[in-house]
Amino acid sequence: LFLGVVVFIGAYLGAGLMLSPSSGRALPIQLALRAAGACAFALLTLVLLVGPLARLSPLFLPLLYNRRLLCVTFVLLALAHGALVILWYHGFSDLNPLVSLLASNPRYDSIQGFPFESLGVAALLVLFLMAATSHDFWNTILGPNMWKALHMSVYWAYALIVAHVMLGAVQGEK
């Protein structure tokens, strides 16, 4: 898993540096934060696909048994993405970086100017709660119904991430 993450991020960085025109090339830190986000999104997509794929073919059963590890790895990558975003885009001002992230763009009434960062933060909070409660101990403490409801919120988080990526891409093309 670790090797796969390293290869994915390395390939993303290499492709980003080699294939983009020099006039519009992103900085290496921007490529790194995008690579961490893209790798996290790919892992989450894989995690969501593993259940149905394991029913179709026994080849996917090893991934099903290791899904918890995939989820924790994906949340760590998403946290790294968020930390790099805060450091690069909001870490060099007098304002607290978290306040800057959430308050710098209040245009919630416009699709073109919507602060897509808030969608990513909301998804990250849900996914962090899921990762923190993924151990069987929390299933006992929370009860099966509450634990299941919390972990079914992954689909809402996935929708938030898709909206975060789409709005970020659209707004980044300006």
Residue spans for each PLM region:
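Membrane-embedded alpha-helical bundles that constitute the cytochrome b-like, heme-associated redox core
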Residues: 1-174
